[in-house]
């Protein structure tokens, strides 16, 4: 691979990264205004974390010592810094507001979890009472249904011990994946269900809840690990099955029936009657949240795409799955949209954009800030990302029947589901549509080596790109397992493509090759 030299006295962004860990040596300089704003939001984050730690100090210390994955949350400030690397203007402001809202909500949920966790409070009557009002659901089932039980808290069961730690610290999944393989599970299965299985084997899921809704999403690996989790968790459970061919009208009655059955199951185990008025209120708030997202997509179609970077898709997933129908989430969305609209109206673009890329397939958890590197190193702006596009339909709240159908659609088009299931048109044809829609000039295709489903149509993507004359780079990754494909190998796939195929030089040569294998 070609070696690049920095011009003049320029040091490049990599000079601010510690060797091997890639932790920033000091705050990133972004100009006076942006640096000050970034610092104030960083202080705000620390305020959120300190407030959470001080609210239940003994309980939180117990959790850190009880659960291996809790150590990852101690590195959140560094994680947020990585997600904001190189950002300026509205992009920086939107990212920081989204991330700080996420931190605020996650810390509140962790307090709810740990207050009821029987591992931390064995024999506690208070914890037992709290568990009667906690509904556990599979992390790939959006919790909007829980709005119909306002007296209960619906918690994405694997979100906090598994999904978020895998983003924050690339090494957090490794121990649990190894445990699942030592237990005898296949080593070639997707790291996501392997991580979940390892948590169950290690008994590292919090012991909470009165019942649990499981799911057949997103793949057969997850279905198999659900059986293992159920044996370990020991809660009354029911599967909320989601149709595979969700584009077909014939399956919609079945999908509605699954929602209705889930409601009956939850009524039985919570002792509460389903509140349709509360559900309607939650759905209407979610519709407004979705409309805010539609605005962001429209803004990204302009010549000044303001809402990009890794924090954009991460926030969308969290909002769709964990805080749909939450008034505070809507308040944050409206604030961020005002910031984004202002920059586009002023015609300001505070970043170097050479290429507009569509990123397709599931992104890599253990390299969550990959989007930032693409822009900072090569000027590749991720104007559209597959994982960001789901749950696009508004829910009709005019009747109970229409809300049930809207919820069924909401579940069928959730994260890691909207494109990987439903037929080739939602995965293959949608790519070419988004490429035109966002005025892109290249495609970055994530090659998740452990995903058998998408791997089966890799050739169709390549044929389609060649037929249309679209530059497409395949970036290998293994979702949550950094021991299979490292971050450096992912970057190298892009580096080789940009040099040999696109015949370009990087925006920042210092970022072409650096060592971050020991990074969180």
Briefly describe each language-model feature range.
Residues 419, 462, 466, 472-518:
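C-terminal regions of proteins
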Residues 148-150, 226-234, 372-377, 459-471:
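Short, surface-exposed basic-aromatic patches at helix termini and helix-loop junctions that form
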Residues 189-205, 265-284, 409-432, 501-520:
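Extended, charge-rich low-complexity interaction segments
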Residues 135-144, 215-222, 360-367, 449-456:
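Gly/Ser/Thr-rich loops at beta-strand to alpha-helix junctions
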Residues 129-131, 139-178, 360-432, 436:
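Redox- and metal-dependent alpha/beta enzyme cores, enriched for Fe-S-associated oxidoreductases
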Residues 208, 435, 439-445:
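Proline-aspartate-enriched helix->loop->beta-strand connector
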Residues 161-252, 474-476:
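Active-site and donor-binding regions of nucleotide-sugar-utilizing enzymes
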Residues 2, 7-8, 12-134, 256, ...:
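A charged, amphipathic alpha-helical module
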């Amino acid at each position: 691979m070609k070696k690049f030299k920095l011009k003049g006295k320029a040091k490049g962004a990599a000079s601010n990264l510690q060797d091997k860990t890639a932790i920033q040596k000091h705050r990133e300089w972004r100009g006076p205004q942006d640096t000050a704003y970034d610092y104030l939001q960083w202080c705000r984050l620390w305020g959120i974390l300190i407030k959470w730690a001080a609210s239940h100090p003994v309980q939180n210390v117990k959790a850190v010592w009880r659960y291996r994955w809790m150590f990852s949350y101690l590195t959140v400030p560094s994680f947020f810094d990585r997600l904001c690397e190189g950002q300026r203007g509205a992009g920086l402001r939107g990212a920081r507001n989204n991330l700080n809202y996420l931190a605020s909500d996650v810390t509140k949920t962790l307090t709810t979890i740990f207050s009821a966790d029987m591992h931390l409070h064995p024999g506690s009557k208070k914890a037992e009472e709290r568990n009667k009002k906690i509904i556990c659901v599979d992390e790939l089932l959006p919790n909007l249904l829980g709005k119909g039980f306002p007296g209960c808290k619906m918690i994405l069961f694997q979100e906090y011990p598994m999904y978020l730690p895998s983003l924050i610290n690339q090494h957090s999944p490794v121990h649990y994946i190894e445990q699942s393989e030592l237990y005898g599970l296949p080593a070639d299965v997707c790291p996501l269900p392997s991580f979940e299985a390892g948590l169950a084997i290690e008994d590292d899921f919090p012991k909470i809840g009165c019942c649990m809704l499981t799911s057949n999403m997103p793949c057969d690996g997850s279905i198999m690990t659900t059986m293992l989790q159920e044996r370990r968790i020991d809660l009354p459970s029911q599967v909320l099955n989601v149709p595979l061919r969700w584009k077909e009208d014939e399956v919609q009655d079945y999908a509605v029936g699954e929602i209705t059955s889930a409601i009956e199951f939850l009524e039985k185990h919570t002792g509460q009657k389903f509140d349709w008025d509360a559900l309607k209120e939650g759905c209407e708030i979610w519709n407004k949240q979705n409309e805010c997202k539609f605005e962001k997509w429209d803004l990204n179609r302009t010549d000044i795409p303001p809402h990009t970077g890794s924090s954009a898709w991460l926030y969308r997933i969290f909002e769709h799955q964990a805080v749909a129908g939450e008034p505070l989430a809507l308040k944050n969305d409206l604030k961020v949209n005002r910031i984004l609209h202002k920059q586009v109206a002023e015609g300001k673009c505070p970043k170097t954009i050479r290429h507009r890329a569509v990123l397709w397939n599931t992104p890599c958890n253990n390299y969550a800030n990959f989007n930032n590197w693409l822009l900072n190193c090569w000027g590749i702006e991720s104007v559209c990302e597959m994982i960001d596009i789901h749950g696009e339909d508004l829910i009709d709240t005019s009747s109970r029947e229409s809300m049930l159908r809207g919820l069924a659609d909401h579940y069928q088009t959730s994260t890691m589901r909207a494109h990987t299931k439903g037929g080739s048109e939602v995965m293959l044809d949608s790519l070419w549509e988004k490429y035109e829609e966002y005025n892109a000039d290249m495609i970055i295709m994530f090659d998740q080596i452990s995903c058998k489903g998408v791997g089966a149509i890799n050739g169709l993507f390549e044929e389609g790109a060649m037929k249309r004359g679209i530059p497409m780079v395949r970036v290998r990754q293994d979702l949550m397992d950094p021991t299979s494909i490292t971050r450096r190998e992912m970057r190298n796939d892009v580096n080789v493509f940009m040099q040999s195929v696109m015949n370009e030089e990087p925006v920042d040569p210092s970022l072409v090759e650096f060592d971050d294998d020991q990074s969180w």
